[in-house]
């Protein structure tokens, strides 16, 4: 058996029906779930990273967990600009929010390659495809919420024109995260933003629901809903 087939059998052997049922409820329209927990996937990823990991990520995955495993492996093995090619090749495999968000959170090397990353992200931040756009927005959320990047984030959000749910939720999540760290700057942006009504209201709601936002902002935020 090769590394892909061998790993697939390990995943099947460590799947849990109850966890599969739980994940199925969280990820609509995803029928290829085994029910393997993320900590176990990370453990398997560590082993694959010591062997022929390039071969493993080259396969077209069948199960959700195989895609998540590839995402984690790419994150672990990415160290410099040349590794953005693996990221580019993986992005078409992002078909739901769980793959997207797991992948983005795994790409920690971006912290040291921000300038190049912004160039790389440009086509995704203007993409009409739901999960390409979500990928770009969640990368901004994970690695670029700093004062010097706020103008870029706000400009990106003002050009946001997408009515697909998971893209809109990513935009709202990004804006609420900006508010947590920079409430006054983000409040100024909200008052003059060009966001569509749905994304704007989702952003306000996520800010209000956050436990990290001072409740003193709530009356004003509620009054700003459209």
Predicted regions mapped to residue ranges:
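Alpha-helical scaffold domains
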Residues: 1-226
């Amino acid at each position: 058996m090769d590394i892909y087939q061998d790993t697939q059998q390990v995943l099947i052997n460590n799947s849990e029906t109850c966890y599969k049922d739980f994940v199925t409820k969280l990820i609509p329209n995803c029928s290829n779930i085994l029910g393997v927990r993320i900590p176990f996937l990370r453990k398997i990823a560590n082993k694959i990273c010591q062997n022929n990991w390039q071969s493993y990520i080259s396969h077209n995955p069948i199960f959700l967990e195989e895609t998540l495993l590839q995402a984690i492996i790419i994150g672990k093995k990415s160290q410099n600009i040349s590794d953005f090619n693996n990221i580019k090749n993986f992005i078409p495999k992002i078909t739901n929010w769980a793959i997207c968000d797991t992948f983005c959170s795994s790409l920690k090397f971006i912290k040291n390659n921000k300038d190049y990353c912004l160039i790389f992200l440009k086509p995704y931040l203007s993409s009409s495809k739901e999960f390409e756009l979500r990928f770009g927005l969640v990368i901004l959320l994970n690695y670029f919420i700093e004062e010097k990047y706020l103008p870029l984030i706000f400009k990106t959000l003002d050009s946001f024109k997408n009515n697909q749910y998971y893209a809109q939720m990513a935009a709202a999540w990004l804006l609420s995260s900006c508010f947590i760290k920079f409430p006054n700057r983000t409040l100024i942006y909200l008052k003059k933003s060009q966001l569509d009504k749905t994304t704007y209201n989702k952003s306000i709601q996520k800010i209000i629901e956050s436990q990290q936002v001072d409740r003193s902002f709530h009356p004003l935020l509620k009054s700003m809903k459209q």
